[in-house]
Each structure stands twice: as C-alpha cells, then as structure tokens.
Amino acid sequence: VLPATADTRTFVTKSIPLNIPLLSSAMDTVTEARMAIAMAQAGGMGILHRNLSLEEQQQQVRRVKRFESGIVYNPVTLSPTQTLADAKALQTKYRVTGFPVVDEKGRLLGIVTNRDMRFASADETPVSKMMTGKNLAVLREPADLAEAKSMMHARRIEKLLVVDQQNKLTGLLTIKDIEQSVLNPDACKDTKGRLRVGAASTVGDNGFERSEQLIDAGVDLLVIDTAHGHSGSVARAVERIKNASNYVQVVAGNVATAEATRALIDAGADAVKVGIGPGSICTTRIVAGVGVPQLTAINDCAEVGAKTGIPVIADGGIKFSGDFAKAIAAGASCAMIGSMLGGTDEAPGEVILYQGRSYKSFRGMGSVGAMAQGSADRYFQKEASAEKLVPEGIEGQVPYKGPAGTVLHQMIGGLRAAMGYTGCATIEDMRTNCNFVKISSAGLKESHVHDVQITRESPNYRVG
C-alpha cells in the first residue's frame, strides 16, 4: 500500500462519514466557527465549545452551515416594504451580502445585493426602490450545478435564485459556494451540501434545552461533554435527546473502561468518546488519581464498540501524528485533537509575543478560568463559587502554528505513512490488522531524535 493511495475515510457515527478521521476539541481556545469551517473543509469536523451563551453557540452553528452551502435552502429574505436599515441589520446578523425579495406568498420579486445597498443613502429607503426586479437570473428546479455555473459565467453574476414552477423562491446559489466545492473536494458535507458541524452540550434540564436549540439551529452532531461519562446523568441525557430527535447524532463521554462504554451504548449513544486525563492540559489523573492510560482505554472501549458497530473517538494525548496513527490502530474510528490545533490562526485568541517567539493562549476546560466562565458543570461543580472550584486542568500557552490546514496536512500525512508501513489500505484495516510491540524507555529514547542538535525545526516534530 502506497501512502498516497491509502483511504482515510471513516465514520464518526454510523450515519456521519468523515473524509479524514479528525475532530477538533470542544475547547474555548480551540474550536469556534472559524475552526469548525476549516475542519469541515479539510474533511473532518469541528465541535463548538459550550463556554458560549446559547444564542452565540446557535449563531456559530448557523455560520458554519451557511458558509459553504451548495444551494442555500430557505435563504434569508426581505419583503418589498422593508428598508435599507433592515437589510443592513440582517447583513450584520447573518454575514451575507445579498437578499432575495419575496411577496407574502413567497413568490420571487427581485434581489438586493451589496451593490444596490451601496448606492442607497437613506436608511429608510424601501427595498422595492433598491432591488433589481427585471431580467433576473433564475434557475428552475431541479437545480443543476453545471447549468448554474454556466449561467453565472454567461451573465457575469455571483448569485443565482432557484424557484419552483409557481415562481416561489426555494433557494439561492452563489459562485463562492461553487468555487469552494472545487477548492475543497474532500469537505465533510451533509445531504444538502452544507458543511457539517458538531457542538458540545451538557446534562440536566439546561443541557437538554441547549441541545434542543442546537438541533433547531441545524447541528449535525451533539456531544454530551462531561469529564465522567459513566454516570446516570449522562445516560439520561443521551436517552432524552434520542427520544426527542431521531435526526441528530449523539456522542457521549468521556469514559475509559469497557463497562462505561457499554452503559453509554445501551443508553443510545451513536459514538463514545474515550479519554480520562490524557490531555496535555489535564490534571485529572494527578488531582483525582483516576484514569486509564489512553492506548489501553481505547483498546478496551473499542472492543465493546465493535460488537455493536458503535464507533469510539480517541480524545486526548495526541502530540505527534504517530500518536494519532496508534490511536486508530488501537481501535478508534477517529481522534479528537486540542493542543495540536491550539495556536493556529483559526483557534480563538490573540497572538502573544513572549521572549521573541509567538504564542497563543491554551487552557483546559477543567482550568479555573474555563470553569469560572461556564464549564464547571463538565466536572460536576456547577454550584461551586469561583474560589471553591477544584480544577482538573491548567492554563498556558502554545507556540503559534499558522493555518490549521498545515497541521491537518502533516497529521494526515503521518497517518498515511503509517498505513503504508503497515500495509493497511483503509482505516478499517488499520483498526483491525495492526500489532503492537512493547517498548522500553531505551526504545522510546531511540525513537526520538538523538545525538544531534536540531538546527531547523520540522513542521511535524517539536520537542519540549
């Protein structure tokens, strides 16, 4: 098997495929809409953190779903009696540059674009005076992308309206979406051509309300995000969400034992997240004295998942692309990474200059700062005041890494190399056909760079 021919497609749940087996972690210094977009365009998926208000998290879900949409079904519209001020407000809210104009029955009347608004000076100018209503470029259902691209090129336009046989607006197509499809052929998309996105929620009534609202916003994957997934509250949360919606897929975690995996699968989880204490910023194993070494945990949990066809996700402990390959070889269907993506352009936060080098802040969701901001219930400390919190993580900084795409390229390149070395053509082969060899401390030392001083840093190998 040549690395270039290795097939990296996998499933995060039975019904959600990924083109690369990577998720970005639901951490407030890793994943917001910008990271989720980058992950989905690369073929993976981003999980939006929940240290956001419900409205902000919903807005970020919508932002990802609208970023690259194929045909935008039910686009934001204006009526002819609305004003320039209304159009500007919607433009700011939804980050779009044009609006179809429809009557009260949904029939298409025209379109208002950025160019139309630029030449209207008064905020009270009605939409009917600004819109282009004649000689509209319209595509009738069923829409064909090749025909749409040809029409856009011929008319020198960037937006195309899709209507049914009664001239009712059914969708909107933009040249940006067509171009993005060409630039990102491996993007992870839903059946409507929109980027896929996940979001973290929690347990209890507040968690259920958040989950319902995220489902309404169009989220593809809900992650019940707790530090201890083998608890009654997590199982009840999974059951409650699955009873409320057959559409949404639910990931539950975190766990580290076969028994815990079995309990969450019995509760209805579509995937189980594995990892207690392996993360670079996590102190659970030291503070609580609880945890299982990550490779052992993945192996034990994956054996249970394999019996029911439920995937497990390796969450934490991945420092190099080789660790990622080992997680897959141990039985994980995909891996969740945090510190690898912390410090990239798409991660939230500003670049900090420290001792001549650039860094970005990075913290665990069990750190004092993150818990005080809203993630305390992840560690079942919701009622504790700030000074009474018992943290299970730290706050720090990681080197600035540039675009997330560069990191993902190196990660997938390392995985492909591992698949080539082991003769595994697919991720399923990798999960089931690899053998592990015990290694001593001397063997580990030998595995790393030794007896030489590094003069030029490699993009996929950093020590310290």
Protein language model features and the residues they cover:
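Short beta-strand/loop segments at the ligand-binding rim of alpha/beta enzyme cores
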Residues: 19-24, 70-75, 190-200, 240-256, ...
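Bateman/CBS regulatory modules and CBS-like beta-alpha motifs in cytosolic regions of diverse proteins
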Residues: 2-18, 25-27, 56-96, 101-103, ...
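Glycine-rich phosphate-binding active-site loops on the catalytic face of alpha/beta enzymes
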Residues: 41-56, 219-231, 270-288, 318-352
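Catalytic cores of alpha/beta
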Residues: 35-36, 209-217, 256-274, 314, ...
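Active-site-adjacent beta->alpha loops and helix N-cap segments on the catalytic face
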Residues: 4, 54-62, 120-124, 144, ...
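Catalytic beta/alpha-barrel core
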Residues: 49-51, 77-78, 98-100, 138-139, ...
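Alpha/beta catalytic cores of nucleotide-metabolism and tRNA/nucleoside-modifying enzymes
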Residues: 1, 78-79, 140, 150, ...
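Terminal amphipathic helices with adjacent charged low-complexity linkers/tails
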Residues: 50-64, 101, 105-121, 152, ...
